[in-house]
């Protein structure tokens, strides 16, 4: 009330119309979220007003010309997130860079994000990535906060270091290498099941639908120890529900705002159901693992909760991150390999020749090595089909200058992975061609800041070593025992509803004789 008293606004004839005006504007905004088709004209007016306000509130100017940083205007309610940024990201990446240049600004909700497209921009930003702060809820709004807002990947500072110390050991390089034999057992069992009960009986394989749960259950064992059939069944049954929740995040609208929690929406009903089931599963898994697998990650996590070091919400969301969130990422990293090998028989033949020369005893060492043709194939696939069109936003602790634009401390950055991995002249002249050989003579120093896969600088994805050995083990088995061929000619079909780049097609997969 101090503001109203100071400015003489406490008289009813002034205060009531003022409050009514605020209520009317708020009601109109909510109406555009609940009934967007009926209030499209109002949405355009709100977009125009907020775009002007946000430009004034978040100035980023060129140090010499004073010109404001270019970029698309804010659009109510989502800005350019998350549909344009992720689902339509491949096409937007090219359009935006062509229209706005090599550095520009987009809006994730009402939060500005500076887009980087060039290798030379990245060193100045990511040299201290361990000191960066991940964007609150990944700039995806309230609904995201209820799924992954407190997970390890979105933490920073002491909390991140503490939780990383608990979550990272099962996924570090020595542990990943020691697990290769166990991973190969999972792979053999999975393909036996596909041949007995799946599409493989008919000589076909869907790179996503037929393989996505294989790496999922391998990681689940690292989290919980050995899994009972009932645990596998419950994890499997939760996957579609969790996948559907991400669609509410992607499409935004009302779910982006805190006020959405007061509405009886289908999104909130599904969220409550999933959170209850997920928490119950993890509690039961903890009690079982305490007896049978005391070193399992779930035991270390819940022990930290009981000591008051972590909250159960942080544990539940981090376990979700390692499984369901990374299910999409690992599936994307694996599945495109099948498509590219099927579409490039000469590369597949070379890989088969290299694998065929191995004895069974040599396979584990081969899977763990980085300089192989298999490793090169995995890298080339991830170059041409980066998991995310734009990276998860994060901010640097100090002011930076990028291409002459002075970026204030705390501003979020994202990297255009298509601009970096594919369109950059570093990969010329055959930027869009699948040619794994390009990685055989490339060192990590050569590739630094030219190639995005697991992040940049000191802070990278903790699951990168496990992801590599899992993908390589699956591809080794696949190419050793089967020949892949394309069933259809033309451009590769992509799942239009997935925020991660996934193929949506079947590949011919015939057992070798």
UniProtKB/Swiss-Prot annotation:
EC class of the enzyme, as a word: oxidoreductase
Cofactor(s) demanded: heme
Principal location: membrane
Pathway in which this enzyme or protein is active: Secondary metabolite biosynthesis
Keyword match Oxidoreductase: yes
Description of what induces expression: Expressed during the earliest stages of maize kernel infection.
Keywords from the UniProt entry: Glycoprotein, Heme, Iron, Membrane, Metal-binding, Monooxygenase, Oxidoreductase, Transmembrane, Transmembrane helix
EC number, UniProt record: 1.-.-.-
GO cellular component: membrane
Protein residues bound to heme: 461
Matching CDD domains: CYP_GliC-like
Function: Cytochrome P450 monooxygenase; part of the gene cluster that mediates the biosynthesis of aspergillic acid, a hydroxamic acid-containing pyrazinone with aliphatic side chains that originates from leucine (Leu) and isoleucine (Ile). Aspergillic acid has antibiotic properties and was shown to be lethal to mice.
Listed PANTHER family: CYTOCHROME P450 307A1-RELATED (PTHR24303:SF31), HEME-BINDING MONOOXYGENASE FAMILY (PTHR24303)
Protein name in UniProt: Cytochrome P450 monooxygenase asaD
Species lineage: Eukaryota, Fungi, Dikarya, Ascomycota, Pezizomycotina
Annotated gene: asaD
């Amino acid at each position: 009330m101090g503001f109203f008293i100071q400015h003489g606004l406490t008289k009813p004839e002034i205060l009531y119309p003022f409050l009514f005006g605020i209520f009317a504007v708020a009601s109109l905004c909510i109406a555009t979220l609940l009934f967007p088709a009926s209030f499209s004209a109002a949405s355009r007016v709100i977009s125009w007003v907020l775009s002007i306000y946000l430009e004034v509130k978040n100035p980023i100017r060129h140090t010499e010309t004073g010109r404001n940083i270019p970029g698309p205007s804010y659009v109510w309610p989502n800005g350019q997130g998350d549909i344009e940024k992720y689902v339509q990201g491949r096409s937007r990446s090219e359009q935006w860079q062509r229209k706005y240049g090599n550095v520009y600004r987009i809006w994730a909700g009402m939060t500005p994000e500076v887009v980087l497209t060039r290798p030379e921009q990245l060193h100045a930003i990511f040299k201290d990535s361990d000191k960066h702060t991940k964007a609150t809820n990944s700039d995806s709004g309230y609904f995201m906060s209820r799924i992954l807002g407190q997970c390890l990947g979105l933490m920073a500072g002491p909390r991140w270091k503490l939780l990383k110390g608990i979550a990272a050991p099962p996924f570090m390089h020595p542990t990943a290498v020691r697990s290769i034999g166990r991973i190969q057992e999972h792979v053999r069992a999975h393909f036996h099941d596909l041949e007995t009960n799946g599409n493989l009986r008919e000589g076909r394989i869907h790179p996503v639908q037929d393989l996505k749960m294989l790496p999922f259950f391998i990681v689940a064992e690292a989290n919980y120890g050995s899994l009972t059939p009932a645990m596998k069944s419950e994890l499997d049954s939760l996957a579609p529900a969790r996948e559907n929740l991400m669609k509410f995040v992607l499409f935004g609208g009302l779910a982006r705002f805190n006020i959405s929690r007061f509405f009886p929406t289908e999104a909130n009903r599904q969220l409550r159901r999933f959170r209850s089931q997920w928490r119950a599963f993890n509690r039961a898994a903890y009690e079982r693992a305490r007896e049978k697998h005391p070193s399992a990650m779930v035991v270390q996590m819940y022990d930290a909760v009981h000591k008051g070091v972590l909250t159960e919400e942080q544990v539940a969301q981090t376990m979700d991150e390692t499984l369901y969130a990374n299910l999409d990422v690992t599936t994307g990293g694996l599945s495109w390999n099948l498509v590219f090998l099927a579409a490039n028989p000469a590369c597949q033949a070379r890989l088969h020749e290299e694998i065929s020369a191995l004895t069974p005893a040599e396979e584990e060492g081969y899977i763990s090595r980085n300089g192989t043709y298999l490793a090169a194939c995995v890298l080339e696939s991830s170059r041409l089909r980066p998991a995310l069109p734009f990276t998860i936003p994060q901010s640097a602790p100090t002011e930076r200058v990028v291409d002459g634009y002075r970026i204030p401390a705390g501003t979020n950055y994202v990297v255009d992975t298509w601009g970096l991995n594919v369109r950059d002249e570093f990969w010329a002249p055959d930027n869009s061609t699948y040619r794994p050989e390009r990685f055989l003579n490339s060192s990590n120093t050569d590739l630094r800041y030219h190639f995005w896969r697991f992040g940049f600088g000191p802070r990278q994805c903790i699951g990168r070593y496990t992801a590599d050995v899992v993908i390589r083990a699956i591809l080794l088995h696949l190419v050793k025992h089967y020949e892949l061929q394309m069933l259809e000619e033309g451009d590769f079909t992509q799942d239009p509803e997935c925020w991660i780049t996934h193929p949506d097609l079947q590949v011919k997969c015939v057992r070798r004789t």
